[in-house]
Each structure stands twice: as C-alpha cells, then as structure tokens.
Curated annotation (Swiss-Prot):
Cytoplasmic-side positions: 1-10, 309-337
Oligomeric and partner information: Homotrimer; each subunit contains a pore through which urea permeates.
Pfam families found in the cross-reference section: UT (PF03253)
Intramembrane segments: 11-26, 31-43, 172-189, 194-205
Compartments where located: Cell membrane
Identification of the protein by name: Urea transporter DVU1160
Residue ranges crossing the lipid bilayer per the database entry: 47-66, 71-93, 99-121, 126-146, 210-229, 238-258, 264-285, 288-308
Alphabetical keyword list: Cell membrane, Membrane, Transmembrane, Transmembrane helix, Transport
Membrane-topology annotation of the record: Multi-pass membrane protein
A cellular component annotation (GO) from this entry: plasma membrane
Organism of origin: Nitratidesulfovibrio vulgaris (strain ATCC 29579 / DSM 644 / CCUG 34227 / NCIMB 8303 / VKM B-1760 / Hildenborough)
Location (main, coarse): membrane
C-alpha cells in the first residue's frame, strides 16, 4: 500500500522509469535490475556512471515532455537507448565537463529516433532495439570530426583493414575464457571490467533466470565463434566478440520467441551470426573511424525476426506482448488450455 502511494510521487515515478530504462538495455523491465546495472557501471567508472544516468534521464524526460504514452515511458522503453548514448560519448572521446550537455542532447535525440522507428517498424511488429542509440551516436560522432566539438580517442582513429595485426594471435588460456565470458556481458554497456560483468549477470538474474542464462550463453558463443574463426586472443579476452551475441541471445532466447528446442537452435544461430557480423561491420567501418557499436546485433536480430514470420515451426511472441521468457511461457500455457 505504502509502496503504491510512493510510486505515485512524480519524482519517485520518474526515477523508477529511469532505472527501468537502464534495465531495458538488456530487455529487463525491472527497477532493481536497472539499479544494479547503474551500480556496475559506477563500479568501473564514475564518469561513465554519471553519463549513463544523465543520458537515461534525458531520453526519459524528453519522452514525457513530448507526450509519449505513459505505459511505454514507465516500462523504460524510451530510456535504454539514452543509457547507451550517454555512455558512448565519454567512452570514445576525451572527457571534459562541457560534454555533459551533449550527453543529454544525444540521449534526448534517441527519443525522437525511437518514436520514428516505432511508427515505421511497428507495421511489421518488429522492435526498434538499440537502433536509436546507434544512429544518434554515429550522427554526433561524424559531426565531431567536422566541427571539432571534442577530441576523439584512440578507439575511433580511422584505419584501413590489415592482416598484419593477425600475425600476433596470442595464446588462448583459461583466462581468455573467464575474462572474455564476463567482459562480453559488461561490454554491452562499454564496461571493460570482469566484476561489472558479473554484476550485470546477477542483475539480469533478479528479473529472469532464463535471460541470465542466455546472456552467459551468448557471451560464450560469441567468444567461441571468434576463436574458431582464428581471431587474435586479445579482443576475444576483452569481450569484444561477445556483447552483440549477448544481446542476440537474450532477445531470441525467450523474449521474442516462445522458448523450446527449435527456438533455442534458432537463437544459437543468431548468436553465432552476431559474432561474425561484429567482425564484418568493424572492418567495414574502421576506414571512417566509426565503431560498430550494437549495429551487428540490430541487423542480425532484425533479419531473424523478419524471417521468423515465415517459419511455421517456431512460435513468435507478439512484440507488444513480449515479457520475460518465463512470463511468455506462462502466457502460452494459459492460452493453450
């Protein structure tokens, strides 16, 4: 009773929406999950933590001010792209206090793009995923090169693809798997920290055991796919081939498809392709100094979702009804009675 009254307070309601927005980065509509995600980011970097909160708050507030349907805002669906957009700027550019205004601007811009994509993709029942974050961030990053707003970091220096870097393959050890597994989860939000990765897995576990399992499976599949395809050890250990597969795994592992053996194998294929696409888009974009971000996850997941409507042997969850994998299975069981 007290909790319900507390949530009616506009400030508390807004903070709850912000936390849920952060949780939705990995499809978790849960306040505690979002708080733990924020905690994991702050554990790794105070600067990235502040920008994550600011970006999420900016995108959520913009949605409220523009009159987006309240249930969508309260579920955090207009917050998660702001989270990623907020973190990306200080991650790829040398941080300075003036950047905070652009963090808020980037977060707010994701709301405009999100609304546009929902109107466009909603006709086919396909979610926008993290496309608003990628499009908004790419636009601002390209602008930085022309307008010299900030100083780009070493991570986005233009470079032609070369096989010379493949000469030093490194040695795969147990450390490669341990670090790569959890850093793959952490890198979903640009966190190169094994403890943060563990916190993220626990945060997902709070809301869904199945999603937590698929996050770990996705990271492992991305890691193994990269090693099988003879990737150098360092990017694998850093989780750089895991994070897109993590998102593919969670999305396909019971969120947008009812989970069974067929959809598990379908999700597995999506995870493998997510890792391959990570390498492909990284090569494609490196000459212009742009990071692939979560674009590999977006493209591969969209392909699998659009294709899913053609396959009679896998049952797709209507986008507007998608919940946790456990909730989706319960709904399916009730509907079949």
């Amino acid at each position: 009773m007290f909790g319900e009254q507390l949530l009616k307070n506009p400030l508390i309601e807004f903070c709850d929406s912000v936390c849920r927005g952060c949780g939705q980065v990995m499809f978790q509509n849960n306040t505690v999950t979002g708080l733990l995600f924020f905690a994991g980011i702050f554990y790794n970097s105070t600067t990235l933590g502040v920008c994550a909160v600011l970006g999420t708050a900016a995108s959520t507030l913009t949605a409220q001010l523009l009159g987006v349907d309240k249930p969508l805002v309260r579920a955090g669906l207009f917050g998660f792209n702001g989270t990623l957009a907020g973190i990306a700027l200080p991650f790829f550019f040398n941080y300075e206090p003036a950047m905070l205004g652009y963090v808020a601007l980037n977060g707010a811009f994701t709301t405009i793009i999100m609304a546009s994509l929902l109107n466009f993709l909603g006709k086919w029942g396909v979610p926008a995923l993290t496309a608003p974050f990628v499009l908004a961030t790419w636009l601002l990053m390209f602008g930085v090169y022309k307008l010299s707003l900030f100083h780009p970091g070493a991570l986005i220096a233009p470079a032609l693809p070369s096989v010379a870097g493949l000469a030093d393959m490194g040695t795969v050890t147990g450390r490669t798997f341990m670090e790569g597994l959890f850093k793959g989860v952490g890198e979903v939000m640009f966190q190169d920290n094994i403890v943060t990765g563990v916190i993220f897995v626990v945060a997902i576990l709070v809301n869904s055991r199945i999603s937590a399992l698929f996050a770990v499976i996705g990271s492992l599949v991305g890691l193994c796919t990269a090693l099988i395809m003879h990737s150098p050890e360092t990017p694998v250990r850093l989780g750089l081939y895991g994070f897109n597969s993590v998102l593919c795994g969670i999305a396909m592992g019971g969120i947008f498809f009812y989970l069974n053996i067929r959809t598990f194998l379908y999700a597995l294929g999506c995870m493998v392709l997510g890792a391959i696409a990570t390498g492909a888009f990284s090569v494609l974009l490196s000459p212009i100094g742009m990071p692939a971000l979560t674009w590999p996850f977006i493209v591969v997941t969209w392909l699998f979702l659009f294709a899913g409507s053609m396959f009679r042997n896998i049952a797709q969850v209507p986008t507007e009804k998608a919940g946790t994998p456990e909730d989706n299975l319960r709904s399916l069981a009730i509907g079949s009675r």
